[in-house]
UniProtKB/Swiss-Prot annotation:
Sites bearing Phosphothreonine, chain numbering: 8, 108, 134, 137
Residues where N6-acetyllysine is found: 16
InterPro entries noted in UniProt: Globin, Globin-like_sf, Globin/Proto, Hemoglobin_a-typ, Hemoglobin_oxygen_transport, Hemoglobin_pi
Tissue: Red blood cells.
Family: Belongs to the globin family.
Record organism: Nasua nasua (Ring-tailed coati)
Single GO MF annotation: oxygen binding
PANTHER family reported in the protein's UniProt record: HEMOGLOBIN FAMILY MEMBER, HEMOGLOBIN SUBUNIT ALPHA
Lineage: Eukaryota, Metazoa, Chordata, Craniata, Vertebrata
SUPFAM superfamilies: Globin-like
Protein's name according to its UniProt entry: Hemoglobin subunit alpha
Residues where heme b binds: 87
């Protein structure tokens, strides 16, 4: 459960990310594909080379979904219900992949905002990404 302090940290960090969210989403996906090659199997139709327009476009979708989640921290299941259905029933993404992407999102954000990435912010973002992952995999059960 996200505490009031977590919610404050998440919202303030996301405001600082601002217009870079889509860029960071693409970068995090590239990191995920490089670090966890099995994740590529869900994107056989994509050009997965660094800087790929398709990876950037999907990174933008990831960033938009996370921005929506940040705006609805008190109702993540409601905000992410459609995405949960998509990933569980249509795409059938292995739940571990959300953990991989979450890790790569943390690395990406820390590399671009080292001064703001305090232990408290790190912990809050980790809890947020974990909460999002839990919601996205909730319909697998």
């Amino acid at each position: 459960v996200l505490s009031p302090a977590d919610k404050t940290n998440i919202k303030s960090t996301w405001e600082k990310i601002g217009s870079h969210a889509s860029e960071y989403g693409g970068e995090a996906l590239e990191r995920t594909f490089a670090s966890f090659p099995t994740t590529k199997t869900y994107f056989p139709h994509f050009d997965l080379s660094p800087g790929s327009a398709q990876v950037k476009a999907h990174g933008k979708k990831v960033a938009e979904a996370l921005t929506n989640a940040v705006a609805h921290l008190d109702d993540l299941p409601g905000a992410l219900s459609t995405l949960s259905d998509l990933h569980a029933y249509k795409l059938r993404v292995d739940p571990v992949n959300f953990k991989f992407l979450s890790h790569c999102l943390l690395v990406t954000l820390a590399s671009h905002h080292p001064a703001e990435f305090t232990p408290a912010v790190h912990a809050s973002l980790d809890k947020f990404f974990s909460s999002v992952s839990t919601v996205l995999t909730s319909k697998y059960r």
